Amino acid sequence: DILAAFRVTPQPGVPPEEAGAAVAAESSTGTWTTVWTDGLTSLDRYKGRCYDIEPVPGEDNQYICYVAYPLDLFEEGSVTNMFTSIVGNVFGFKALRALRLEDLRIPVAYVKTFQGPPHGIQVERDKLNKYGRPLLGCTIKPKLGLSAKNYGRAVYECLRGGLDFTKDDENVNSQPFMRWRDRFLFCAEAIYKAQAETGEIKGHYLNATAGTCEEMMKRAIFARELGVPIVMHDYLTGGFTANTSLAHYCRDNGLLLHIHRAMHAVIDRQKNHGIHFRVLAKALRMSGGDHIHSGTVVGKLEGERDITLGFVDLLRDDYIEKDRSRGIYFTQDWVSLPGVLPVASGGIHVWHMPALTEIFGDDSVLQFGGGTLGHPWGNAPGAVANRVALEACVQARNEGRDLAREGNEIIREASKWSPELAAACEVWKEIKFEFQAMDTLDK
């Protein structure tokens, strides 16, 4: 069975048992009345079952309801069908004040029907020939308005300065100021020029997201013809059907696939209604993607540390034990489905580097947009500052130093022999994003 943990807030007067049973029925075989065709099938075989209910600590009228769905209810290899069944209609139920899908346990038999990420963490490292450290990226800014040639120039400067990747912003598709084909050509030129100068393999996340699947595939095919290593997709706005199609193409044609989660906070930010991001992350690993944005813990975007590390493990590891202290409701066995690199991006700069290295470890992408392009000396010095800070943090960690306690000192020491890093440290020494997270663990 697929197991689901729902956070249920019933309307006043509705018992939790009735609410849990209604969720199980509506998301499987039930309807609002008895129908004569019920007698033509075995409802006992196909119906969802609410098998446990527990009150949420510290909340008045809120419960975690556990529902089991027989595997026969789901089409093999289809995240689209899985979500249509489990969350398709039930969230509009009048008997419920609010409903949130907190977690899913995907059984081994169902996991094996999915290709998953096009390549996974180890294959990506082998393709890039980069080991023993997080990868470094940068989102090109301003996100909208640059011509293709100026955009390509910014890509070149960042890659030449020491970054591994640069990135299209999620809303860069094919607008009047910069059509996709022009952008792809100038970015490919920038990649090859930077590779020739640095001797390192470089990449730019070329956003293939489009209004139709056919147009999306046309862009991915052109990227492959240019010989670039990676393309990008906005998987929630583009949809799981399009994403899975693109992931299959990427595996067949040797392209890495970067995934942006644009629109996720509409779905996952409210604590009592929607779908938790750990579910969207699991779904992405099944649908296919080699990177996905996962929050930063320390930057400008939502994300409590324990919760973030919980779904980071669900993205990367092969077997994850149930751990309610990190929001993981079920033990998950991925049976060697390739892992996904979490991408930390959003309001981060060089002073965050020790914390990011300590929190996310080597198998991650640390992505600095404003934290690269906002450097007072330009894009290439901004990239140099980030690369020096990262190398210093990795070296200090490997020497046994405590990044959590000594992080600022490590950055200061490195800045003494890197004027680019020293300038970055001065610019961003006062920048902090100290707001309470909306989505917190139940105490």
From Swiss-Prot:
E.C. numbers: 4.1.1.39
Q: Keyword check for Amino-acid biosynthesis, yes or no.
A: no
**Residues annotated as site: Transition state stabilizer:** 300
Chief site of localization: plastid
Compartments reported by the entry: Plastid, Chloroplast
Kindly list the GO molecular function terms attached to this UniProt entry: magnesium ion binding; monooxygenase activity; ribulose-bisphosphate carboxylase activity
Give cofactor(s), names only: Mg(2+)
Residues that coordinate or bind substrate:
89, 139, 143, 261, 293, 345
Among PROSITE patterns, the record links this protein to: RUBISCO_LARGE
Keyword vocabulary terms for this entry:
Calvin cycle, Carbon dioxide fixation, Chloroplast, Disulfide bond, Lyase, Magnesium, Metal-binding, Monooxygenase, Oxidoreductase, Photorespiration, Photosynthesis, Plastid
Q: List the active-site residues.
A: 141, 260
The entry's Mg(2+)-binding residues are 167, 169-170
* Sites of N6-carboxylysine modification: 167
- Name the Pfam families on file: RuBisCO_large, RuBisCO_large_N
- Post-translational modifications: The disulfide bond which can form in the large chain dimeric partners within the hexadecamer appears to be associated with oxidative stress and protein turnover.
UniProt-listed CDD domains: RuBisCO_large_I
Quote the cofactor binding remark: Binds 1 Mg(2+) ion per subunit.
Lineage, top-rank taxon, reads Eukaryota
What else does the entry mention about this protein?
The basic functional RuBisCO is composed of a large chain homodimer in a 'head-to-tail' conformation. In form I RuBisCO this homodimer is arranged in a barrel-like tetramer with the small subunits forming a tetrameric 'cap' on each end of the 'barrel'.
Family from the record: Belongs to the RuBisCO large chain family. Type I subfamily.
- Assembly behavior: Heterohexadecamer of 8 large chains and 8 small chains; disulfide-linked. The disulfide link is formed within the large subunit homodimers.
NCBIfam families reported in the protein's UniProt record: PRK04208.1
Q: What is this protein called?
A: Ribulose bisphosphate carboxylase large chain
Q: What is the lineage of its organism?
A: Eukaryota, Viridiplantae, Streptophyta, Embryophyta, Tracheophyta
- What gene name does this entry carry? rbcL
